[in-house]
């Protein structure tokens, strides 16, 4: 199974009681995934596709590999977050994923099924959104060193993207270094739980094609001049 997917999230719409809105963080990731998946069907799968059931439910599980490229918007540009190591904790570009879920198949014709799936992808990383540490207290001084006093440091975007809380920004939207120092880096980021990994839920609608030996003669390359009707069943 090969997939291209986008995941994203942002704090501003969150319930104020969740304490996420003040972080003002967001991300977007567009990734590629390749996985090997096995299915267990409610009704037995027939040897010949022409005799398969018109409707079937199934469970599935598998293992795969996905890219992991979270980005955040700074001005009009989307910046790659992984190379910046905002939390001083490097993570891999490729991650393991474990697809699980349920699905349904409806027989459209001899060679194709309409499929609908509800699936959840488990992972072994907490950095699909580039956010893991509870706050910046352990690395805020490194962020400030890269930023400088007024953004003249060697890598100022690290601090700009790590701290978006408006309480620690100046009137121009730039990090207020003195406020950050006075706070001691106790500025919230993530859960801070090492054992909690990221995952994502999706709904998939697709077409499944059965590549039986007679598909080329009977469906794709059949003589359409002599045969006027389209044969579905």
In which residue ranges do the predicted regions lie?
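Residues that define the transmembrane beta-barrel architecture of outer-membrane proteins
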Residues: 30-34, 55, 94-98, 199-203
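Short loop/turn motifs that connect adjacent beta-strands in outer-membrane beta-barrel proteins
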Residues: 44-55, 108-111, 213-233
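Outer-membrane beta-barrel proteins
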Residues: 7-13, 45-49, 68-73, 113, ...
